[in-house]
Amino acid sequence: MPSGLICVARIGAPHGVRGAVRLWSFTADPFAVSDYGPLVTKDGARQFEIASAREAKSHLVVTLKGVTTRDEAERLNGVELYVARDKLPPTEADEYYHADLIGLAAVTTTGDPLGKVVAIHNFGAGDIIEIAPPSGPTLLLPFTNAVVPTVDLAVGQVVIEPPNEIEGDTPNHPEA
């Protein structure tokens, strides 16, 4: 398991006048973010502990120990919260933390280099893997078993089976 900090949440706008904030949790179970103990900023300069949490529409509403006013809460808007990697539970087979995938080499099933994994996105319809080739625009591909049949963390690469549209095959249309 790689070391370092993993981003598990982002603080949003204040909620109410007593220092509560909206919190977007990046954990599978949104409430698990409070199980990891104190959360820190990326630079480690500030530490936050969740005193209470409740579910809202698409986020949590939390109170943080030591944050008691709306003004204090407003200053935290946009702050990302991290935990040490070793505090996270181990992944199941075919499950990965996004942080483990970032920076891996991306190669085709024939071994040709495609680039490096720069991000994993989810816009609501499933995970998307973003690959930056050595030159040109990035590739956004569905992170499915069909398109990404192999993830090898030990070797440091993902194997990509590019869809036909990506490979540049000509469509089966007579007018093309």
Swiss-Prot record:
The keyword Chloroplast does not apply. One of its GO terms (molecular function) is ribosome binding. Coiled coil: none annotated. One of its GO terms (biological process) is ribosomal small subunit biogenesis. The keyword rRNA processing applies. Residues 93-166 form the PRC barrel domain. Its main location: cytoplasm. One of its GO terms (cellular component) is ribosome. It is found in: Cytoplasm. Pfam families: PRC_RimM (PF24986), RimM (PF01782). Keywords: Chaperone, Cytoplasm, Ribosome biogenesis, rRNA processing. InterPro entries: PRC_barrel-like_sf (IPR011033), PRC_RimM (IPR056792), RimM (IPR011961), RimM_N (IPR002676), RimM_N_sf (IPR036976), Transl_B-barrel_sf (IPR009000). An accessory protein needed during the final step in the assembly of 30S ribosomal subunit, possibly for assembly of the head region. Essential for efficient processing of 16S rRNA. May be needed both before and after RbfA during the maturation of 16S rRNA. It has affinity for free ribosomal 30S subunits but not for 70S ribosomes. Belongs to the RimM family. Binds ribosomal protein uS19. The PRC barrel domain binds ribosomal protein uS19. HAMAP family: Ribosome_mat_RimM. This is Ribosome maturation factor RimM. The gene is rimM.
